[in-house]
Amino acid sequence: MDIKAYFELIRLKNCLTASFGAFIGGLIASYFNLAMVDNLILASIVVFLVCGFGNALNDIYDLKIDRINKPKRPIPSKRITLNNAKVFSYSLVVMGLFISLFNISCFLMAVLNSIVLQQYASTYKKNKIIGNLIVAYLTGSVFIFGGIAVGNIDVTIMLFLCALFAMWSREIIKDYEDIEGDLKEKVISIPIKCGERSIYIAAFLLIFAIFLSPLPYLFGFFGIYYMISVVFCDLLFLFGIYKLVFNPSKMEAKKASRNIKIVTNLVLIAFLIGSLFK
C-alpha cells in the first residue's frame, strides 16, 4: 500500500491545519485549562478524520476532471483505485463519528459537517456562490468544535464568525483571480455573475468581519491586550482590501487572498493572547 498516496488523497497538510484549529479553539474557549487536554486531543482527531473524508471525497467526485487537469493525483494516476478510495474515505468518517461520541454535541456537529462535506463534493463544488459559503463555514466551524469539546462556545462563536466572513471574502477573491478557468469549467461564481463588482462584495464581507472583531472585548470575554492585537490585524485587513478595490487586477487579487489568509492566522493569535491575558 502506497501510504504517501493516501496522505496525498486526504491532503495531509489541510487535515493537520484543521485539527490544529480545533485544538486552538478549545484552548481559547477553556482559557488554557490543561485539564481539558484529553477532550481537545479527541476533538482534533475527529476533525482530522472528517476533514480527510471530505478531501478524499472531493477527489472521488472530481475523477473525470482530474484525469485531464490533475493526472498525477492518487486516483487518476491509479496509485489508489476508485473503490479503495471510497472504502478509505468512508472508513475515515465512520472512525471520526465513533470517536466524537465522547461528547454528544461534538457527535452531532461531526454528523452535520460530514453531511455538508458530502453535499459540497457532490453538488455545490461547481456552484461557488453556495460553495464559497460552505468552505467558509467549514473553516470557521473547527473553532466551535473545539469550544464544544471543552463545554464553552461563547468566545469561539465570535472567532467562528470572524473566520467565516474573512474566508468567504477570500473565496470570492480567489474566484475573481480564477475567473477564466471557471468559465472553461462552466462553474457558477459571484465574479462570473458580477465581474469587478464582486470585489466590492468581498470587501463588504471582510469589513463585516472587522466590525465583529471587537466583540470579545466589548462583551468582556477578553481584555485590552486582545483589543490592541486585533486592531493591528484589522488595519492589515483594510490595507489589503483597499489596494484591491482601487486596483482590481488579478495580481492584486492574489496578494489580497494571501493577505487575508495570513492575517486570519494573526487574528487567531490575537484570540490566544486574549485568552491568556484576560
Curated annotation (Swiss-Prot):
What biological process terms from GO does the record include? glycerophospholipid biosynthetic process
Q: Name one Pfam family in it.
A: UbiA
Domain of life of the native organism: Archaea
- Write out the annotated subcellular location: Cell membrane
- Write out the GO cellular component annotations: plasma membrane
Give the residue range of the signal peptide.
none
Assigned keywords, A-Z: Cell membrane, Lipid biosynthesis, Lipid metabolism, Magnesium, Membrane, Phospholipid biosynthesis, Phospholipid metabolism, Transferase, Transmembrane, Transmembrane helix
What is the membrane topology listed in the Swiss-Prot or TrEMBL record?
Multi-pass membrane protein
Q: Tell me its EC number(s), please.
A: 2.5.1.42
Which InterPro entries has this protein been placed in? Answer: DGGGP_synth, Prenyltransferase_related, UbiA_prenyltransferase, UbiA_sf
* Pathway the protein acts in: Membrane lipid metabolism; glycerophospholipid metabolism
* A Gene Ontology molecular function term of the record: geranylgeranylglycerol-phosphate geranylgeranyltransferase activity
CDD domains for the chain: PT_UbiA_DGGGPS (cd13961)
Its UniProt entry gives the catalysed reaction(s) as: sn-3-O-(geranylgeranyl)glycerol 1-phosphate + (2E,6E,10E)-geranylgeranyl diphosphate = 2,3-bis-O-(geranylgeranyl)-sn-glycerol 1-phosphate + diphosphate
Q: Which prosthetic group or cofactor does it need? A: Mg(2+)
Sequence similarity:
Belongs to the UbiA prenyltransferase family. DGGGP synthase subfamily.
- Please explain the role this protein plays, according to its UniProt record: Prenyltransferase that catalyzes the transfer of the geranylgeranyl moiety of geranylgeranyl diphosphate (GGPP) to the C2 hydroxyl of (S)-3-O-geranylgeranylglyceryl phosphate (GGGP). This reaction is the second ether-bond-formation step in the biosynthesis of archaeal membrane lipids.
Name used for this protein in its record: Digeranylgeranylglyceryl phosphate synthase
Q: Which organism is it from?
A: Methanococcus maripaludis (strain DSM 14266 / JCM 13030 / NBRC 101832 / S2 / LL)
Q: Give the taxonomic lineage as stored in the record.
A: Archaea, Methanobacteriati, Methanobacteriota, Methanomada group, Methanococci
